[in-house]
Amino acid sequence: MPAPKSLFQQQDAAPALSRDDAKKLTDRILSFAKADETRVNVNSGTAGNTRFAGGQVTTSGNVSDTTVTVVSTIGRKRASATTNVLDDDSLRRTVDLAERLARLSPDDPELMPELGPQQYLTIQNRFASTAGLTAEQRVAAANAVIA
């Protein structure tokens, strides 16, 4: 039987999508769309966690995920579908689901049109000093607060 994994062994999570990769993903999804209007929201990130109970570390690790929400508008009907499976077949099914749900939805008398493509500022949303913390460093920081 293999030994259990160490709570302190650094497990690298997949990195969050770059801006270029998010744009490519969005373009791929939009190529599957047949609705009058389609909005794609991409959320990608990584996080580290360390949990304590009874004055001891109980879990520690890294989590990485990318989710995509497709919002389809057909006439005056709108619906959305979300996935975190990013292969073409899954993305196609997600677009199809959003479009089918939109067709089933009642007309929205207050529906506003989508804004269209937007320009976003580049921001520093990741700090290497925080992102690079090891499990040991997170434990030391938590112990300093708990003690």
Task: Go through each PLM region and give its residues.
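Active-site bordering "gate/hinge" segments
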Residues: 1-147
